Amino acid sequence: MSILEVKGLTKSFGDNTVLKGIDFTLEKGEVLSIIGSSGGGKTTLLRCLNSLEFAEKGTITVNGDVIFDGADKSRRKEKDIRLKRLHFGLVFQQFNLFPQYTVTENVTLAPRLMGNQSKEEIEREAQALIERVGLSDKAENYPCELSGGQQQRVAIARALAMKPDILCFDEPTSALDPELTGEVLKVIRGLKSEDTTMIVVTHEMGFAQSVSDKVMFMADGVIEEMGTPEAVFEKPQSEKTKAFLANANEK
């Protein structure tokens, strides 16, 4: 059984349809990279998966449970939405850390609010996550004392603290200087080695090619092409994919 199944996802903003019947599946432990030009629907897809936006049509199924059905508006109460979001962790382009909290406090905040674990257990797991992203020596620092790359790694640890089924990244390196990009991509590569299921919207073609199990190219609200990195990057079938990759290679 697939960990994620998306069927017929359609989303519009006014007269502009930004997702036009999106269909795909993801297996546990797979990494899916989503590439494409701005305005293709990539970020909107992530926002729909995370219940930050609601599609008009389609279904989202996680581990066999339908967590979203465009035809059923009865399950959009705040409590239901919060529960749906637990399936997905989302790391944004901007780090969105709470500036008044330390690294440890940022990572432990959501689990403490959930109230399902003891304080000791939350602290222990947070320290393990902070170590996992290579920031043990910064655990008591505040965001203003960290580099952009370090802040993004804290954001990754914070997302992992909720134990999501699927970890989503929306252009995780786009706000970083080139020299800081590598440290964030290294963390994501480490997560892959631990069989973390991930969806990564990225403009880093080398990363998408080397780390992904699947690559999705989106254009104008549709999946123009999807397959293994070898198939998409070396033998693209769509003319739009070919044009996008040719342009990306020139940059």
Residue ranges and their predicted role:
Residues 142-146, 150:
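Conserved ABC ATPase signature
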Residues 101-109:
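Short coil-to-helix segment of the ABC ATPase nucleotide-binding domain corresponding to the Q-loop/switch region
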Residues 50:
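Helix-to-loop junction immediately C-terminal to a conserved catalytic motif
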